[in-house]
C-alpha cells in the first residue's frame, strides 16, 4: 500500500501561489489558530502523481463492468456533465433574488413535470438529497396527512422482508413501528399475511416494484386495494424504477407517493457518498404537505411557492443538489419518451440474458423471469465446497469485474445480486458468465484458491469485519511527527 498524502509531506514543498488580486484583509487574532494546521506539504507534481496512482485503484463504470445489484450502475453520458458545468448554472448562488435565477427555477420545474409524467404523480419536490432522505421525507408527508385528518392511531409502517434496509430505518426515524410482511414462495408479498396485518393502525406499506429480488409484484393492484381499504397509503420505493420507466407508472398501479433516485435511474454519477438526489412525487391529495419551497407553474412560467401552511417544512438547505438535477434533466431530454422506454427494455433483457447464462451452473433464488436484476444463491456450493458467496464475488475482481451485491436480500442465503443495466454489451455479459463459470469450477477443484482472491490487485482480501467494527476515519500522525 502506498503512503498517505500526509506521509509524503516535506516541509517547504508547495504549489506556486497565485498573486493576490484583491486588497489584503487581516482577520482579528481571536479568529486565528494558535498553531499551524497539520496539512500535507507537497509540490503540484507530487500531488498529481499521488492522486493519479490512487485513481488506478478505483473501479468505476467508466473503466469496468459494475453489476452491483439494486444500485443501477449504468454509464453516465458525458453530455450530462457538460450541461452541469455550464457557467450560467455554476455561477449562480441560491441566495440570489428569485428574478435573477429564472432559468434554474424553470429547469427544476420542468424536471419535476417530466418526473411526474414518468411516475404518474401530480406534484414533485426535488429537495431530498438521497434515496433514504427521499424515503424519510415521503414518510413525513404520510404522517402529516394522517395527523391532519385526526387519524393519530396510524403509527405502523408495513415493510416486506425483501425490502431495502433503509425502509425500516426511515420508518423508525419518523417515530413509526415497523411491521414485517413475509414473501410467498414466488418471491412476492404474501397477500394473505398482508390481509391479516393491515388495520386501523396502518399508516402505509413501503413497496418496491419490481421488488428487491428483481421480481415484479404481480398482485400490485390487489395490494393497493387492500392497503387503501384499511385506510393506509401505498409508498413506492423508486430504487428499481429503471426496470419499468416508460412502460408502467407507479401512479397507475395504485401508489400514492414515490421517491426516485436520480443518481441511479436517471444516470447521474454516484458512489463514494454522493452527491445524490431523491425527489419525491405524490398524488394531488398529498401535495399540500410537500417541503417548501415548491416550484409551481408551467410552460416557462415557474416560481417558488413558500405559501404552504400544511407543508412539512424544509428538509434541507436551499433547493436540493441542483447540478444533479441538471444531469438528470439532460438525460431525460436526450433520450425522450421512446429512449426511456428502450432503456428499461434493454435493462430487463440484459438481466434475463445473464441469468439464463448462469442458471446452468448456479441456483437462482426464484425461478421466474426477472426484471432488471436477479439473485443467485450459493448455499449449495458453500455446503459442498466451503466456498462462500464472498469468495466468488472477490474472484471477479481479478478479471476486472466489480463484485455484485453480496448477502442481500437477507431472505436469500449466500446471495449474489446482479444488475447489468441497459448500457452493457452482450460481449461483456458473455465474459462475466465465463468468469463466473470458471470460478465455480475452481470452487470444486481448488477451494483454497478461492479463499484468497483477489491476487492481482494492489489491495488483496480486506478484513471487512474489522473495518466495520474498528473504522479508522481520519489520519493520526505518529508521536514523532507531532
UniProtKB/Swiss-Prot annotation:
This is Probable glycine dehydrogenase (decarboxylating) subunit 2. The lineage of its organism: Bacteria, Pseudomonadati, Spirochaetota, Spirochaetia, Spirochaetales. The modification N6-(pyridoxal phosphate)lysine is found at residue 264. SUPFAM superfamilies: PLP-dependent transferases. GO terms for cellular component: cytosol; glycine cleavage complex. It comes from the Bacteria. The gene is gcvPB. Coiled coil: none annotated. Keywords: Oxidoreductase, Pyridoxal phosphate. InterPro entries: Aminotrans_V_dom, GcvPB, GDC-P_C, GDC_P, PyrdxlP-dep_Trfase, PyrdxlP-dep_Trfase_major, PyrdxlP-dep_Trfase_small. The glycine cleavage system is composed of four proteins: P, T, L and H. In this organism, the P 'protein' is a heterodimer of two subunits. Its EC number is 1.4.4.2. It catalyses: N(6)-[(R)-lipoyl]-L-lysyl-[glycine-cleavage complex H protein] + glycine + H(+) = N(6)-[(R)-S(8)-aminomethyldihydrolipoyl]-L-lysyl-[glycine-cleavage complex H protein] + CO2. One of its GO terms (biological process) is glycine decarboxylation via glycine cleavage system. GO terms for molecular function: glycine binding; glycine dehydrogenase (decarboxylating) activity; pyridoxal phosphate binding. Pfam families: Aminotran_5, GcvP2_C. Belongs to the GcvP family. C-terminal subunit subfamily. Its cofactor is pyridoxal 5'-phosphate. The glycine cleavage system catalyzes the degradation of glycine. The P protein binds the alpha-amino group of glycine through its pyridoxal phosphate cofactor; CO(2) is released and the remaining methylamine moiety is then transferred to the lipoamide cofactor of the H protein.
Amino acid at each position: 500500500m502506498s503512503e498517505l498524502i500526509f506521509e509524503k509531506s516535506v516541509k517547504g514543498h508547495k504549489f506556486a501561489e497565485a498573486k493576490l488580486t484583491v486588497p489584503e484583509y487581516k482577520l482579528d487574532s481571536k479568529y486565528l489558530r494558535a498553531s499551524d494546521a497539520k496539512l500535507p506539504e507537497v509540490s503540484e507534481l507530487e500531488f498529481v502523481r499521488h492522486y493519479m496512482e490512487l485513481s488506478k485503484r478505483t473501479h468505476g463504470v467508466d473503466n469496468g463492468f459494475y453489476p452491483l445489484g439494486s444500485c443501477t450502475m449504468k454509464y453516465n453520458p458525458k453530455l450530462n456533465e457538460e450541461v452541469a458545468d455550464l457557467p450560467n448554472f455554476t455561477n449562480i448562488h441560491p441566495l440570489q433574488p428569485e428574478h435573477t435565477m429564472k432559468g434554474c427555477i424553470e429547469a427544476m420545474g420542468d424536471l419535476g413535470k417530466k418526473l411526474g409524467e414518468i411516475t404518474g404523480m401530480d406534484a414533485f419536490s426535488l429537495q431530498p438529497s438521497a434515496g433514504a432522505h427521499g424515503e424519510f421525507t415521503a414518510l413525513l408527508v404520510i404522517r402529516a396527512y394522517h395527523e391532519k385528518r385526526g387519524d393519530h392511531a396510524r403509527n405502523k409502517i408495513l415493510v416486506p422482508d425483501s425490502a431495502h434496509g433503509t425502509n425500516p430505518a426511515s420508518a423508525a426515524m419518523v417515530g413509526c413501528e415497523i411491521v414485517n410482511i413475509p414473501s410467498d414462495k414466488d418471491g412476492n408479498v404474501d397477500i394473505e399475511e398482508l390481509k391479516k396485518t393491515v388495520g386501523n393502525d396502518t399508516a402505509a406499506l413501503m413497496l418496491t416494484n419490481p421488488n428487491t429480488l428483481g421480481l415484479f409484484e404481480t398482485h400490485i393492484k390487489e395490494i393497493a386495494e387492500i392497503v387503501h381499504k384499511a385506510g393506509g397509503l401505498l409508498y413506492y420505493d423508486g430504487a428499481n424504477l429503471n426496470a419499468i420507466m416508460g412502460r408502467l407508472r407507479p401512479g397507475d398501479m395504485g401508489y400514492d407517493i414515490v421517491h426516485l433516485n436520480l443518481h441511479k435511474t436517471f444516470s447521474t454519477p454516484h458512489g463514494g457518498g454522493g452527491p445524490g438526489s431523491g425527489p419525491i412525487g405524490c398524488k394531488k391529495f398529498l401535495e399540500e404537505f410537500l417541503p417548501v419551497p415548491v416550484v409551481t407553474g408551467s410552460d416557462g412560467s415557474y416560481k417558488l411557492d413558500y405559501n404552504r401552511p400544511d407543508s412539512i417544512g424544509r428538509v434541507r438547505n436551499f433547493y436540493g443538489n441542483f447540478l444533479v438535477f441538471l444531469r438528470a434533466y439532460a438525460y431525460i431530454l436526450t433520450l425522450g419518451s421512446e429512449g426511456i422506454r428502450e432503456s428499461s427494455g434493454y435493462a430487463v433483457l440484459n438481466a434475463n440474458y445473464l441469468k439464463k447464462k448462469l442458471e446452468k451452473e448456479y441456483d437462482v433464488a426464484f425461478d421466474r423471469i426477472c426484471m432488471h436484476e436477479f439473485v443467485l444463491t450459493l448455499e449449495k456450493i458453500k455446503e459442498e465446497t466451503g466456498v462462500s458467496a464472498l469468495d466468488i464475488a472477490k474472484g471477479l475482481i481479478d478479471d476486472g469485474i466489480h463484485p455484485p451485491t453480496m448477502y442481500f436480500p437477507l431472505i436469500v442465503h449466500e446471495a449474489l445480486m446482479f444488475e447489468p443495466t441497459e448500457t452493457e454489451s452482450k460481449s461483456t455479459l458473455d465474459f462475466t458468465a465465463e468468469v463466473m463459470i470458471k470460478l465455480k469450477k475452481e470452487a470444486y477443484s481448488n477451494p483454497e484458491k478461492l479463499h484468497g482472491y483477489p491476487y492481482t490487485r494492489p489491495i488483496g482480501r480486506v478484513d471487512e469485519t474489522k473495518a466495520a467494527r474498528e473504522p479508522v476515519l481520519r489520519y493520526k500522525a505518529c508521536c514523532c511527527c507531532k
